[in-house]
Amino acid sequence: MIMRFGYVSHAMALWDCSPAKTMTFTSFQKLSKQEREDKLYDVTRQNLEHTIRILHYNIAHEIPLYRLSSSIVPLATHPEVEFDYIGLFTPLWRKIGALIKEHNLRVSFHPNQFTLFTSDKPHITTNAITDMTYHYKVLDAIGIADSSYINIHVGGAYGNKEKAVERFHENIKKLPAHIKRQMTLENDDKTYTTAETLSICQKEKIPFVFDYHHHMANLCEEPLEELLPAIFETWAHTNILPKVHISSPKSKKEFRAHAEYIDLEFIKPFLHVAKKVNHNFDIMIESKQKDLAMLQFIHELSAIRGIKRINSSTLQW
């Protein structure tokens, strides 16, 4: 069983390299037309250049997974902001794409919790489609739209989970088919359990990104030993490895909050279940210390008898 690792957005080991520098709409409004254009251009350019720097860092450390920042373009989906964030930066998008393709990196997006399809309010669904379209346009500009995924949660229950799931199945029909093909769903830590999310994924033929921390915070009756093979099976039609999210609780009191690093003892039960399935898969580390937490976790795992470190960020068990 091969396990490849990656992390989210910021490389903590790099100085002043945020790929998510932003500006608020309030500050945007205070500027003149030219100042607005200049500020949007400068911040986006810096975010793209920092992303390129991070990708070089990942390549040097043999890190095959990376989640791009959704904030790479400030105010990209704001209805009162017009900005040609694709055309103005074509060379930089292409440079990012060239690095990803040359080094066979797996990158993804994870929009925020407001991008959902369970609401009974039409404008929420419209906003979700706008946000998914923005993420897809960026992947397309990079040249990887047909091989990269945009991951979201199912959404809220709004007092009636059954009705909310019905709305999800109806509202998702409004999302263009080419974008839906690049969509994944993740179980959350309060509302939709692993089993419930799996059922939706199976009906919609959407790959399931399993989050173990969320699963432990929002348990279902079905044992993980039964669920995990079915979760991995949702990826079968993609020819891409299943991906899981790993983090551990900040404390018993703040169980849902992410700790700075990974607690190996918390993760071990999942790893033993995964070993029984014995299917190659990718792991996205969601700890606060990002790449540093990932490298420390890999180091700790590689010390376990039977686990072999193939390279900096890949293990065999």
From Swiss-Prot:
<keyword id="KW-0228">DNA excision</keyword>
<comment type="similarity">
    <text>Belongs to the uve1/UvsE family.</text>
</comment>
<keyword id="KW-0540">Nuclease</keyword>
<keyword id="KW-0227">DNA damage</keyword>
<dbReference type="InterPro" id="IPR023520">
    <property type="entry name" value="UvdE_bac"/>
</dbReference>
<dbReference type="GO" id="GO:0006289">
    <property type="term" value="P:nucleotide-excision repair"/>
</dbReference>
<dbReference type="GO" id="GO:0006290">
    <property type="term" value="P:pyrimidine dimer repair"/>
</dbReference>
<dbReference type="InterPro" id="IPR004601">
    <property type="entry name" value="UvdE"/>
</dbReference>
<keyword id="KW-0255">Endonuclease</keyword>
<keyword id="KW-0234">DNA repair</keyword>
<keyword id="KW-0378">Hydrolase</keyword>
<comment type="function">
    <text>Component in a DNA repair pathway. Removal of UV LIGHT damaged nucleotides. Recognizes pyrimidine dimers and cleave a phosphodiester bond immediately 5' to the lesion.</text>
</comment>
<dbReference type="GO" id="GO:0004519">
    <property type="term" value="F:endonuclease activity"/>
</dbReference>
<dbReference type="GO" id="GO:0009411">
    <property type="term" value="P:response to UV"/>
</dbReference>
<dbReference type="Pfam" id="PF03851">
    <property type="entry name" value="UvdE"/>
</dbReference>
<dbReference type="InterPro" id="IPR036237">
    <property type="entry name" value="Xyl_isomerase-like_sf"/>
</dbReference>
<protein>
    <recommendedName>
        <fullName>UV DNA damage endonuclease</fullName>
        <ecNumber>3.-.-.-</ecNumber>
    </recommendedName>
</protein>
